[in-house]
Regions:
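Structural signature of the two symmetry-related core transmembrane helices
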Residues: 37-52, 252-267
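Juxtamembrane intracellular "pre-TM" segments in multi-pass secondary transporters
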Residues: 150-188, 214-215, 378
Length: 378
């Protein structure tokens, strides 16, 4: 068993290697377009999930926490922290090419997460290794689906691409130009001060949740069932989220997500019963649809869509991981010294402050407006 500080070290290592790989994955994703080379790499690594966790990661953590953190950080940084973002960006790219909403496709991910949460909550109490082997098995199914899929651009998108309309050649220089855009840094302020702090809060929330039950095993089971119910609700909201975000605007969607995150963290600092932490856990399911859909729509409306993967993996995921390297270890130490409640009060005040600041730093009003970068030339 790891202490809260050691757990924070592991999460910091994952964040560190995500910092290294996410820029690479973002640039590769925008360069590859609809080609599946990167997805195949991620899928193969997912198939090795069980052997890695059982025969490599777990023994290393028991022998040496630093060595285990480094090896685990490399694998998890590639497959999950960077890989999941690359997959999200690929799905969003396919949705734009074929004129359907990303949020409606993401519903399947919510349902899958709900089923996994309920199953793993029980299986972890029996034998965690069962869960790892199931993950490798589903990765094989993913490989089959990836082989069968044939993503293509819509006919109109293909004609536009062939004529060269709206084309801006992808290059490292083009991506680097983002660093000179004030609106890019305004987006970073939101990601680091709100989304990143919230992610660090959520990393060890399961441990806080389990402390309200008679035994950790019972807490794990209840946490799994609550997550299942919440993710099913998440799926419903995610299906409706594109229409809601189109109406209120991407900026307001991100601000709404920030307020929900702040309420959940601050509420957790005052929670005193199992019922209260269950309700607070359910708030997560309202926040995720607004954050994900709002982020992609904000990127596509405020920046060049050809750099969507780079913006998502660097501007969103990488920024969260970069700040997470520092925050995870610091917050883990706070949990050990002042306890969950006091730490949550501090984190909640931080997210609320940055959410209010984002009213100024984020670009856009109530409606999504095209930019000069995304409009075709007259």
């Amino acid at each position: 068993h790891l202490t809260k500080t050691e757990t924070g070290i592991v999460f910091s290592s994952i964040s560190l290697f995500a910092i290294i790989f996410q820029p690479v994955f973002g640039l590769m994703s925008d360069k590859l377009g609809l080609r599946k080379h990167l997805l195949w790499t991620i899928t193969v690594l997912l198939i090795l999930f069980a052997p890695f966790f059982i025969f490599v990661f777990s023994p290393l953590l028991q022998m040496n926490i630093i060595a285990g953190s480094l090896v685990g950080g490399i694998y998890l940084g590639i497959v999950f922290s960077s890989g999941s973002g690359a997959v999200e960006a690929y799905i969003e790219r396919v949705s734009r090419a074929n004129r359907f909403e990303y949020g409606k496709v993401r519903v399947a991910g919510c349902v899958g997460w709900a089923l996994c949460a309920s199953i793993t909550g029980v299986l972890f109490s029996i034998d965690p290794n069962i869960t790892f082997w199931i993950a490798s098995g589903f990765a094989l199914v993913l490989g089959l689906l990836l082989w069968l899929s044939r993503p293509e651009s819509s006919n109109s998108a293909q004609v536009i691409e062939a004529l060269g309309a709206n084309r801006q050649a992808f290059s490292l220089r083009t991506a680097a130009e983002l660093l000179r855009m004030p609106r890019f840094w305004g987006f970073i302020v939101y990601v680091v001060g709100v989304a990143s702090v919230y992610d660090v809060f959520d990393q060890q929330f399961a441990n806080f949740f389990k402390s309200f039950f008679a035994s950790p095993q019972r807490g794990t089971e209840v946490f799994g069932f609550v997550t299942t119910g919440g993710e099913l609700l998440n799926a419903l909201i995610m299906f409706c989220a594109p229409a809601i975000v189109n109406r209120i605007g991407a900026k307001n969607a991100l601000l709404t997500a920030g307020m929900i995150m702040s309420v959940r963290i601050l509420g957790s600092s005052f929670a005193s019963s199992a019922v209260e932490v269950v309700i607070l856990k359910m708030l997560h399911m309202f926040e995720i649809p607004f954050l994900l859909v709002g982020t992609f729509k904000y990127i596509s409306s405020a920046f060049n869509p050809r750099l969507s993967a780079t913006l998502f993996l660097i501007g969103f995921n990488l920024s969260k991981q970069l700040s997470g390297v520092v925050l995870s270890a610091w917050v883990g130490r706070m949990y050990d010294t002042v306890g969950f409640h006091q730490a949550y009060l501090i984190l909640g005040c931080i997210t609320l402050s940055f959410t209010l600041l984002s009213f100024v730093t984020l670009r856009g009003g109530n409606r999504l407006l095209p930019t000069a970068e995304t409009q075709s030339p007259a």
